[in-house]
């Protein structure tokens, strides 16, 4: 469960290392976001020479959460960290590589480019 002011690790090679959630997209009163949800965030930590700089406002999709999520078959999925992938305006990932596993929920939300770049889909 990601909400305003939540900090997430960035799971791609855009140059950002950590982002801070500004807003959860999807309705005016929406408070929490899970795997596959889009957020607006600001870059808090970045490496020199990357595509994004500290202070940039970006859109990102959540790919891993510590809070478990119940699936349709009754199983639960959870990860060791909260992580996101930075997006372009058209919804494609800004980076060219994805690090670590991603949730299967991204397939249902039509983030096929992220699914194809990810090393593992759980």
Curated annotation (Swiss-Prot):
Identification of the protein by name: Large ribosomal subunit protein uL14
CC annotations in GO: cytosolic large ribosomal subunit
Subunit-structure text: Part of the 50S ribosomal subunit. Forms a cluster with proteins L3 and L19. In the 70S ribosome, L14 and L19 interact and together make contacts with the 16S rRNA in bridges B5 and B8.
Keywords per UniProt: Ribonucleoprotein, Ribosomal protein, RNA-binding, rRNA-binding
InterPro entries: Ribosomal_uL14, Ribosomal_uL14_bac-type, Ribosomal_uL14_CS, Ribosomal_uL14_sf
Similarity remark: Belongs to the universal ribosomal protein uL14 family.
Function: Binds to 23S rRNA. Forms part of two intersubunit bridges in the 70S ribosome.
One annotated GO biological process: translation
Pfam families: Ribosomal_L14
Organism whose genome encodes this protein: Streptomyces griseus subsp. griseus (strain JCM 4626 / CBS 651.72 / NBRC 13350 / KCC S-0626 / ISP 5235)
A GO molecular-function annotation: structural constituent of ribosome
């Amino acid at each position: 469960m990601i909400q305003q002011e939540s900090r997430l690790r960035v799971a791609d090679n855009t140059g950002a290392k950590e982002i801070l959630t500004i807003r959860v997209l999807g309705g005016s009163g929406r408070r929490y976001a899970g795997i596959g949800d889009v957020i607006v965030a600001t870059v808090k930590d970045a490496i020199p020479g990357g595509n994004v700089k500290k202070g940039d406002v970006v859109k990102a999709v959540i790919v891993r959460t510590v809070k478990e999520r119940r699936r349709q078959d009754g199983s639960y999925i959870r990860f060791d960290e909260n992580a996101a992938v930075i997006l372009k305006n058209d919804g494609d990932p800004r980076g060219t590589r994805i690090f670590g596993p991603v949730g299967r929920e991204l397939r249902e939300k039509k983030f096929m480019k992220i699914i194809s770049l990810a090393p593992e889909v759980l």
